[in-house]
UniProtKB/Swiss-Prot annotation:
Comment on bound cofactor: Binds 5 Ca(2+) ions per subunit.
Described function: Catalyzes the citrullination/deimination of arginine residues of proteins such as histones, thereby playing a key role in histone code and regulation of stem cell maintenance. Citrullinates histone H1 at 'Arg-54' (to form H1R54ci), histone H3 at 'Arg-2', 'Arg-8', 'Arg-17' and/or 'Arg-26' (to form H3R2ci, H3R8ci, H3R17ci, H3R26ci, respectively) and histone H4 at 'Arg-3' (to form H4R3ci).
Gene behind this protein: PADI4
Listed name of the protein: Protein-arginine deiminase type-4
EC number: 3.5.3.15
Catalysed reactions listed for this entry: L-arginyl-[protein] + H2O = L-citrullyl-[protein] + NH4(+)
Residues the entry annotates as binding Ca(2+) 1: N153, D155, D157, D165, D176, D179
Sequence positions that bind Ca(2+) 2: D155, D157, D179, D388
InterPro entries (alphabetical): Cupredoxin (IPR008972), PAD (IPR004303), PAD_C (IPR013530), PAD_central_sf (IPR036556), PAD_N (IPR013732), PAD_N_sf (IPR038685), Prot_Arg_deaminase_cen_dom (IPR013733)
Provenance organism: Homo sapiens
Chief subcellular location: cytoplasm
Effect of R374Q: Impaired binding of TDFA Inhibitor
Length: 663
């Protein structure tokens, strides 16, 4: 039960006070008691509940009431059963007794009022009265937790605008309202109560730039909503009529959790006594609701695909046909960014990552725009953000970034359990250097801080700076599986590739050619690849780098060797001794449910079939997966990327609700 104010009574004159339903009000009967009195009794109107905490009563009176010793150890508290119909209609009488004095009486006239600020703290999608049931001032995680949730209103319902909805002080329409959380103020008072009292809605100055509150002034029409709290207004006096009244507010978050903002916002209603115009307003009662801003959540390859994105560039028609066919098989929507918009920047994966935000009443996809800002820089803002599709970005928009700030370097695992700790939404994975140096690269700290601040997908930092491009999607991927943990981790493996080529040579296929059928590309025999000492040394180094990540992933994702599949792949060291794929990197695949779009490796053809494709199919098809090998050699591979780099996927949000986890 909420704590009310302290009421002091005196025999000299009647005391008038307000008691809010659902609060426990302390009654001071000692400080003004007559000097010669040693005990007291209390009688109250039927609408008042009096509780006295002490030892046994001093004496039982003939009328049935009891007396208690008058000492500071006695605690007297009041609660109200019902709201008053008129001012001061509930009475409490305190009678003081002394051994040589007649009884002395003190009168207290109470006005019971109902004032309740309600939000969806039970996370059911509906606002329910919570007076005297739950403490709305705390926010707790877990299936038994409580606390209201806010969405950052980061979509753009007005197609004529270039800004997010949260960047203005207006409510566009009912769709805009649905992106906000409802909060209701319920009051029940005597008709004349607000002649001498007023209500103020307020937010801490440290949080005022993180939230905006609109008041529905006429019903629930969006056109009749006016802003009352926000970056310019930390408080607002409310015009509330007496009697029984409900007032609706719509609340939107303006910022995601980040290193300087834990994501919690407290809105408070204060009841002020304004009866004496010569004195400052006095606080009678406060009620607060704590909201948590919904985090941005990534979706792993194991989530069902809903929409595929790719770019149209010069001479990639065949690539797009293959992606289109794959999307149709997976029953996905396909969005193509035309050449005139992408400015010959085909790296759709690097430009953005599509996740979502969720409250009990609304789920919203949100595109996270990387700070790379190349040819595709306008695509997330102009073509992805829109009605019910949000937008967020972090990091410097000009300069100060590296290749590791592109989102091919940002992945997320499927749900895992690690040493008894559950990660029901998986864990974020991004690449970094193994130690800082003048030559090392790392993901920008602003991006790292943002990802960590979301709390629900605790990030794991991998080692990817050994790669020329430096992205984690160059050596790992996840695919769904029907058994074990529900997925497999795929890792690029030079060791597996050398083993396969050695087996083929042992069977008499040493003359078989890599890159056969690729124009203007030097073909290489299996036997020459196996005897190339420099290439062996390069891949020995790469294997050690991948093995480092292998052990890190096993430890941080709780994986066993049986959860990992090695995909045969060779690398070569180029400028600055950084690695890049020797042939199209098959682990850099597009995963659409059971349909996989894998870079065509152009491996040695043996008995009419590419031995690399055959090996990969033998590893993945037993899991119920269908492998489609896509030719990306000239349009993507030679430009240091593959199928995954050139595509992006919006996936179905988790059925698991993020607020039910414990970070």
């Amino acid at each position: 039960m909420a704590q009310g104010t302290l009421i002091r009574v005196t025999p000299e004159q009647p005391t008038h006070a307000v008691c809010v339903l659902g609060t426990l009000t302390q009654l001071d009967i000692c400080s003004s008691a007559p000097e010669d009195c040693t005990s007291f009794s209390i009688n109250a109107s039927p609408g008042v509940v009096v509780d006295i905490a002490h030892g046994p009563p001093a004496k039982k009176k003939s009328t049935g009431s009891s007396t208690w010793p008058l000492d500071p150890g006695v605690e007297v508290t009041l609660t109200m059963k019902v709201a008053s119909g008129s001012t001061g209609d509930q009475k409490v009488q305190i009678s003081y007794y002394g051994p040589k004095t007649p009884p002395v009486k003190a009168l207290l006239y109470l006005t019971g009022v109902e004032i309740s600020l309600c939000a969806d703290i039970t996370r059911t999608g509906k606002v329910k009265p919570t007076r005297a049931v739950k403490d709305q001032r705390t926010w707790t995680w877990g299936p038994c937790g409580q606390g209201a949730i806010l969405l950052v209103n980061c979509d753009r319902d007005n197609l004529e605008s270039s800004a997010m909805d949260c960047e203005d002080d207006e409510v566009l329409d009912s769709e805009d309202l649905q992106d906000m959380s409802l909060m209701t103020l319920s009051t029940k008072t005597p008709k004349d109560f607000f002649t001498n009292h007023t209500l103020v809605l307020h937010v801490a100055r440290s949080e005022m730039d993180k939230v905006r509150v609109f008041q529905a002034t006429r019903g629930k029409l969006s056109s009749k909503c006016s802003v009352v709290l926000g970056p310019k207004w930390p408080s607002h006096y409310l015009m509330v009529p007496g009697g029984k009244h409900n007032m609706d507010f719509y609340v939107e978050a303006l910022a995601f959790p980040d290193t300087d903002f834990p994501g919690l916002i407290t809105l408070t209603i204060s009841l002020l006594d304004t009866s004496n115009l010569e004195l400052p307003e006095a606080v009678v009662f406060q009620d607060s609701v704590v909201f948590r801003v919904a985090p941005w959540i990534m979706t792993p390859n194991t989530q069902p695909p809903q929409e595929v994105y790719a770019c149209s560039i010069f001479e990639n028609e065949d690539f797009l046909k293959s992606v289109t066919t794959l999307a149709m098989k997976a029953k996905c929507k396909l969005t193509i960014c035309p050449e005139e918009e992408n400015m010959d920047d085909q790296w759709m994966q690097d430009e953005m990552e599509i996740g979502y935000i969720q409250a009990p009443h609304k789920t919203l996809p949100v595109v996270f725009d990387s700070p790379r800002n190349r040819g595709l820089k306008e695509f997330p803002i102009k073509r992805v953000m829109g009605p019910d599709f949000g937008y967020v970005t972090r990091g410097p928009q000009t300069g100060g970034i590296s290749g590791l700030d592109s989102f091919g370097n940002l992945e997320v695992s499927p749900p895992v359990t690690v040493r008894g700790k559950e990660y029901p939404l998986g864990r974020i994975l991004f690449g970094d250097s193994c130690y800082p140096s003048n030559d090392s690269r790392q993901m920008h700290q602003a991006l790292q801080d943002f990802l960590s601040a979301q709390q629900v997908q605790a990030p794991v930092k991998l080692y990817s700076d050994w790669l020329s491009v430096g992205h984690v999607d160059e050596f790992l991927s996840f695919v769904p599986a029907p058994d074990r943990k529900g997925f497999r981790l795929l890792l690029a493996s030079p060791r597996s590739c050398y083993k396969l080529f050695q087996e083929q040579q042992n069977e008499g296929h040493g003359e078989a050619l890599l890159f056969e059928g690729i124009k203007k590309k030097k073909q290489q025999k299996i036997k020459n690849i196996l005897s190339n000492k420099t290439l062996r040394e390069h891949n020995s180094f790469v294997e050690r780098c991948i093995d480092w990540n292998r052990e890190l992933l096993k430890r941080e994702l709780g994986l066993a060797e049986s959860d990992i599949i090695d995909i045969p792949q060779l690398f070569k060291l180029k400028e600055f001794s950084k690695a890049e794929a020797f042939f199209p990197n098959m682990v850099n695949m597009l995963v659409l449910g059971k349909h996989l779009g894998i870079p065509k490796p152009f491996g040695p053809v043996i008995n009419g079939r590419c031995c690399l494709e055959e090996k990969v199919c033998s590893l993945l098809e037993p899991l119920g997966l269908q492998c489609t090998f896509i030719n990306d050699f000239f349009t993507y591979h030679i430009r240091h990327g593959e199928v995954h780099c050139g595509t992006n996927v919006r996936r179905k949000p988790f059925s698991f609700k993020w607020w039910n986890m414990v970070p």
